[in-house]
């Protein structure tokens, strides 16, 4: 499904929170949306592998990487795992790498920057926790919509049709 965050903001102005414009689109989908699962991890993506092995249909993984752009939390291998398990998208408050490969994949990926250095894989972090970045607080179960214009968040799903 295609989402237009500008149109959604016009219709649901009182019901959405708008994430500050810190992110760029690195995935092959221009827009994506779904119910979110939150993760907090710093320069370590081991926990992301565990989560992205689950069925992601209708879901978006929101990762608070502490805003670090020193190590990439998502690479092509991890993004392919997300595609294989039907995740709608990834929002990374941090960095990604292998961007030429990422843009070929049928998944939305919003991140702050790209860097060639990969993350550790120790599995340090926590999931289903409140995370805060970009002026917005995210809770697992909220609904996120993203396109090339921006990212918005709603407690309840928005009626798109």
Swiss-Prot record:
CDD domains: RraA_family (cd16841)
Cytoplasm listed as a keyword: yes
Keyword Cytoplasm annotated: yes
Matches recorded under Gene3D superfamilies: Ribonuclease E inhibitor RraA/RraA-like (3.50.30.40)
Keyword annotations: Cytoplasm
Any GO CC annotation of this UniProt entry: protein-containing complex
Primary location: cytoplasm
Induction: Induced upon entry into stationary phase, in a RpoS-dependent manner. Stability of the rraA transcript is Rne dependent, suggesting the existence of a feedback mechanism in the regulation of RraA level.
Segments crossing the lipid bilayer: none
Pfam families, per database record: RraA-like
Entry's Gene Ontology molecular function annotations: endoribonuclease inhibitor activity; enzyme binding; identical protein binding; ribonuclease inhibitor activity
Subcellular location: Cytoplasm
A GO BP annotation: negative regulation of RNA catabolic process
InterPro entries: RraA (IPR010203), RraA/RraA-like (IPR005493), RraA/RraA-like_sf (IPR036704), RraA_gpbac (IPR014339)
Alphabetized NCBIfam families for the sequence: NOT-MenG, PRK09372.1, RraA_entero
Note: RraA and RraB interact with Rne at separate sites within the Rne and exert distinct effects on the composition of the degradosome, affecting distinct sets of RNA transcripts.
Family to which this protein belongs: Belongs to the RraA family.
Purpose: Globally modulates RNA abundance by binding to RNase E (Rne) and regulating its endonucleolytic activity. Can modulate Rne action in a substrate-dependent manner by altering the composition of the degradosome. Modulates RNA-binding and helicase activities of the degradosome.
Subunit structure: Homotrimer. Forms a ring-like structure with a central cavity. Binds to both RNA-binding sites in the C-terminal region of Rne and to RhlB.
Protein name: Regulator of ribonuclease activity A
Lineage, broadest ranks: Bacteria, Pseudomonadati, Pseudomonadota, Gammaproteobacteria, Enterobacterales
